[in-house]
Amino acid sequence: MRLLDLVAQSTNAAPTLPQGWALPGAHHFADAVRTCPLRLVLADDLIQCTNLLAYAEGERLSGCLDLIHVPSEQVWLEWLEATRQSALRAIPHCASTPCSSVRRHTGVLIAADLAGRTGTMRTFWSAHNEQAYCAALLTDFDLDHVIRPALDIEAALGGAAVGVAMPEEAALDELLSHVRFRLDAAWADYYRAADLDASQQLLLLREVLGTTAFDMPMILALFLLFAAKDGLQHQVVDLERLNHARRCSGKHALLDHIEVRAPITARYEYPRSVANTAARRRGPRLHHVRGHIARRGDKVFWRLPHLRGNARLGVVRSRTVQLSFR
């Protein structure tokens, strides 16, 4: 079952910890997901595409922030976590990115301002037991201003906002400067009362930030494609017959949603072939060529990442995708 339905149908009580601490659960946000006007489910090709675009070099995604906006004041996004992790591992400098082996699907519920430039994002995930879980961390973003605060571990566990910096990876660091993270108030109260020592605080903060911090670049890349002409392919899922059968059997109806694909890269490569490789001159050693973004006014040119140096990988017709915003 999709994560959006697991959250919408969630009725489990919030997790209760020793000493009576009641913490937010997925069921607290069931109504918000059910009433969300825009629910998007990302196809595998789009998950791969947005991750590649997010970490492209050149002017980088951060040079296109003025073109990005959240398309609705309330948005639900959902993706298959295994596909996202596979896409990150395929990017050489992201191979060591923290990944969760527990999550099956990951989703975010975004509340944005009318312009779609600032907002807050809450993360959810499902495990293989078909249970929905709510993250302890909230993500605030502002695409017009740098909002990254200094790192203060003790203050962060008390509910203050915290930033994530990656100076060794400029493409990601620029995006993260527009993002800050903070614990849900109930979780902050719980951790503050736990009286953790410095090493425990550091370990905990790494755990809660480890996977969530790397969602935002992919999401921003998605919204860039969303704003571009013909950047995405939308398919409204028709659940009328299925839901009729579910109601007749006493089950909850599934939520309408839109499946989103990325057709923009399909025409840029020929199928892989080993034909005529003997006639080709010997090329350089096989190596990875990183994606590259160049912007010319309202047009963005994205040079796709690719492998170079081995003809057996196929004949490439073009590796440049043009995104137009007018």
Whereabouts are the PLM-identified features?
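Intrinsically disordered, low-complexity regulatory segments
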Residues: M1-P271
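Arg/Lys-rich, low-complexity, intrinsically disordered basic segments
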Residues: V237-R326
